[in-house]
């Protein structure tokens, strides 16, 4: 579109974020909302992109209230600068020692849903809230609930021959679906629509044009359209995956755990169910005593089951730095989860949700698991186009499967916009460059710099200028001075050693803690020696020759055969090292309780006892891609073996779980791995090279699910390191390295029953029900109108407390 801009890689691409937060550490009686505008460049290596030193505070919109549609008034100086930078500014290139004309373009904005409406000009409230569907949406206002619902708005995204389209009463009452998906409106079409609108509405006021809320949701012409290239951008405003995932997760948790006042399956939802669906067994039933019976839904837990889930979460242990303290969110006595931050919901949604609700029937659990897998794949640090296309096809089916189970009140704007996330990922790439986690942490730092509450914005500006000046000047000093403290799970760099050192002896990690001596017995000596030999690259040709000869078992015969072969070869430095390897290690080895390697922090099983975190789980990848020959275990000892010529190698002595079907089960669809924790591997092969290990943790199932007792779900973790470096980074949102193999969702679980007949429903007084009907206020947990821009950031912009047990 702009080849002259693209041909020079030195031209800068920017992203912009603006969001409101309360600039006080402690709660204040007077609400105050401050809006910083943050700009970040994308022309950086992945480990530097969107980090705090490269997030620039361009302006601050003062409080005490949010600027609503008048935010463009404050953005006008920034837009003027961006227009000038698009033309170009003379800049010195230090690498080429020359001046060049540097140009800058703003790629997109990153905001939560309310701020999305302020910056784009399309209001994100009401039944037309979706900025992709716009006026082509089929959402409607619930008559009893009084809020917008996107129930039965996703069948139109399905293939034309899909069976769901023909179901008359499985979704909306007496309704089939023949329409296709809403058209994708181009940037030029949007520009033509907003050209006649006002640019600068009054600050703090909203402008309503004719047809607002019925045929459109435009409130203004956004100031970003003043940028000459803005109408050429395919993705102008990002849907924030962080807040969408949190709201989706909260709705699931509150509904399944039947939290009073927050569940989407309340009395109003049951009354709306009668109007819009054919589910008579779920409707409120008038009893002879004048009260109404609310049948117990099959998708909700009983009070005891909810308490069991909270107790399970309170006792859950995960690796250091993996998550914040989830135990603080679990109310065991009440059976509720409270005070969950965005990253807590992130971990719960993508990792723990299918385990927590494993007792639900398949037609409820399977779509919840598919939602969990969808966000897990979407949030991977590496995305593949073919897999994103499958995800874009799968998510409408998943939402339709949820619509068969949950009431219309469950489906608000947050559930609906998830249908557009895979498409935005196709346009914009991985979500770690388009979500709000880095900006929330930046605002959390800004909050802690406020010293003068009477001059909030001035305090933030002064502190930011000091930080920016210090970081700029630090580039003129030694690079080592830029890192004032050691980073998590730091490992040593490879040191200068002999060029003849064998690959297996090259250092890869560092121990921590007190050192002890351990004397290995004969069986341990033989197993350790053979394991080191067969994992040495230089021994590979000998090992292949030994296997072709078929002269015996590797663990019993290879060591002596290898010695004999080396005696026939002329001496050289490498051969001498191989002979030292063949002679085996010393019987006395060094032992530690902690070891850092591959970006992981490993503990022995005994060292983790009594701690809030657990780092003893280990996983070794097998040869096949299906995971059938993978090994899972726990670390019993951490040994350093010593050989001649001052060569050392670190081994983990592990207790391996039974890899057969009796001890390890792999879900063929979702690839979840379950381990029977009381079954062990029969063969004596306990050792594994520390450099070849990955970390897992084992999550037991809640106690109320009797069929899963004794089994744990093995969850793999990712090393918390910088990209392509050995030095781990600070706290960042958890992501998988790559997407799982995304398969098309074709299995349709029949909905056999929606009512739990084994549990009595709750009775409601007629007076209470009448009072609810007379109350025209929306549900307290309405996601589209939950004052997200006022209070949710008080949680999210504070750094989570990541547990570290030494």
Predicted stretch roles:
Residues 3-6, 181, 202, 506, ...:
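Acidic, serine/threonine- and proline/glycine-rich intrinsically disordered low-complexity regions
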Residues 293-294, 300-303, 307-328, 438, ...:
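C-terminal catalytic/scaffold cores in eukaryotic proteins
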Residues 1-4, 38, 46, 576-577, ...:
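Active-site-proximal segments of catalytic enzyme domains
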Residues 303, 314-317, 322-382:
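Long alpha-helical repeat solenoid scaffolds
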Residues 1-296, 342, 365-463, 476, ...:
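Domain-level cores of phosphate- or acyl-group-handling catalytic modules
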Residues 11, 244-247, 278-281, 285-288, ...:
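Short, conserved interaction/coordination micro-motifs, predominantly
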Residues 403, 407-410, 447, 451, ...:
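Hydrophobic, aromatic-enriched, well-ordered structural segments
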């Amino acid at each position: 579109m702009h080849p002259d801009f693209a041909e020079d890689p030195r031209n800068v691409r920017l992203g912009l974020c603006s969001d409101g937060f309360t600039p006080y550490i402690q709660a204040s009686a007077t609400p105050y909302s401050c809006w910083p505008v943050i700009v970040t460049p994308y022309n950086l290596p992945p480990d530097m992109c969107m980090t705090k030193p490269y997030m620039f505070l361009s302006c601050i919109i003062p409080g005490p209230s949010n600027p609503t549609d008048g935010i463009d008034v404050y953005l006008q100086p920034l837009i003027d600068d961006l227009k000038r930078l698009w033309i170009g500014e003379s800049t010195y290139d230090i690498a080429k020692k020359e001046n060049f004309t540097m140009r800058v373009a703003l790629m997109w904005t990153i905001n939560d849903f309310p701020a999305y409406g302020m910056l784009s000009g399309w209001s994100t409230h009401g039944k037309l809230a979706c900025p992709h569907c716009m006026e082509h949406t089929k959402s409607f206002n619930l008559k009893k609930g009084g809020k917008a619902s996107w129930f039965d708005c996703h069948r139109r995204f399905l293939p034309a021959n899909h069976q769901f389209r023909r179901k008359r009463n499985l979704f909306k009452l007496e309704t089939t679906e023949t329409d296709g998906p809403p058209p994708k409106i181009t940037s030029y079409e949007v520009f033509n629509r907003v050209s006649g609108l006002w640019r600068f509405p009054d600050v703090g006021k909203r402008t309503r044009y004719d047809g607002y809320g019925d045929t459109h949701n435009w409130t203004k012409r956004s100031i970003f359209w003043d940028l000459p290239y803005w109408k050429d951008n395919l993705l102008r405003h990002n849907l924030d995956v962080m807040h969408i995932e949190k709201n989706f997760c909260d709705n699931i948790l509150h509904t399944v755990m039947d939290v009073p006042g927050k569940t989407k399956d309340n009395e109003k939802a049951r009354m709306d169910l009668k109007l819009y669906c054919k589910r008579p067994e779920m409707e409120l039933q008038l009893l002879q005593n004048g009260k109404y019976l609310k049948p117990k839904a099959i998708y909700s837990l009983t009070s005891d089951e909810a308490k069991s889930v909270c107790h399970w979460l309170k006792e859950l242990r995960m690796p250091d730095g993996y998550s914040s303290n989830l135990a603080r969110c679990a109310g065991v006595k009440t059976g509720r989860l409270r005070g969950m931050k965005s990253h807590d919901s992130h971990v719960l949604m993508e990792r723990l949700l299918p385990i927590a609700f494993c007792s639900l029937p398949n037609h409820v659990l399977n779509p919840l698991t598919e939602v969990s897998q969808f966000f897990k794949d979407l949030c991977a640090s590496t995305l593949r186009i073919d897999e994103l296309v499958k995800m874009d096809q799968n998510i409408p089916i998943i939402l339709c499967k949820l619509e068969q189970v949950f009431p219309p009140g469950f489906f608000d704007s947050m559930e609906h916009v998830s249908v557009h996330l895979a498409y935005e990922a196709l346009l914009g790439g991985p979500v770690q460059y388009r979500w709000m986690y880095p900006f929330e942490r930046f605002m959390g730092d800004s909050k802690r710099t406020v010293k003068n509450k009477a001059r909030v914005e001035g305090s933030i500006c002064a502190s930011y200028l000091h930080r920016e000046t210090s970081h700029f000047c630090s580039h003129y000093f030694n690079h080592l001075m830029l890192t004032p403290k050691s980073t998590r799970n730091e490992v040593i760099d490879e040191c200068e050693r002999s060029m003849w050192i064998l690959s297996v002896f090259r250092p890869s990690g560092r121990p921590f803690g007190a050192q002890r001596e351990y004397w290995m017995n004969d069986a341990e000596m033989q197993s350790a020696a053979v394991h080191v030999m067969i994992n040495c690259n230089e021994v590979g040709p000998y090992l292949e020759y030994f296997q072709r000869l078929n002269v015996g078992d590797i663990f019993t015969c290879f060591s002596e055969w290898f010695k004999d072969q080396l005696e026939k070869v002329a001496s050289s430095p490498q051969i001498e090292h191989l002979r030292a390897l063949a002679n085996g290690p010393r019987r006395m080895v060094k032992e530690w309780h902690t070891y850092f390697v591959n970006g992981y922090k490993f503990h022995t099983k005994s060292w983790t006892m009594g701690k809030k975190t657990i780092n003893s789980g280990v996983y070794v990848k097998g040869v096949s891609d299906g995971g059938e020959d993978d090994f899972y275990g726990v670390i019993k000892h951490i040994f350093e073996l010593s050989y001649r010529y001052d060569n050392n190698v670190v081994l983990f002595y592990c207790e391996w779980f039974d890899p057969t079907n009796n001890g390890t089960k792999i879900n063929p669809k979702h690839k979840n791995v379950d381990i029977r924790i009381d079954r062990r591997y029969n063969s004596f092969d306990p050792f594994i090279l520390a450099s070849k290990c990955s970390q897992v943790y084992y999550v037991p199932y809640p106690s109320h699910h009797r069929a899963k007792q004794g089994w744990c779900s093995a969850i793999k973790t990712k090393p918390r390191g910088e990209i392509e470096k050995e030095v781990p980074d600070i706290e960042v949102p958890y992501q998988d390295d790559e997407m799982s193999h995304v398969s098309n969702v074709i299995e349709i679980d029949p909905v056999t029953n929606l009512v739990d007949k084994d549990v009595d429903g709750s009775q409601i007084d007629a007076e209470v029900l009448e009072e609810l009907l007379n109350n025209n206020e929306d549900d307290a947990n309405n996601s589209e109108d939950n004052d997200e821009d006022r209070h949710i950031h008080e949680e999210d912009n504070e750094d989570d407390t990541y547990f570290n047990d030494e």
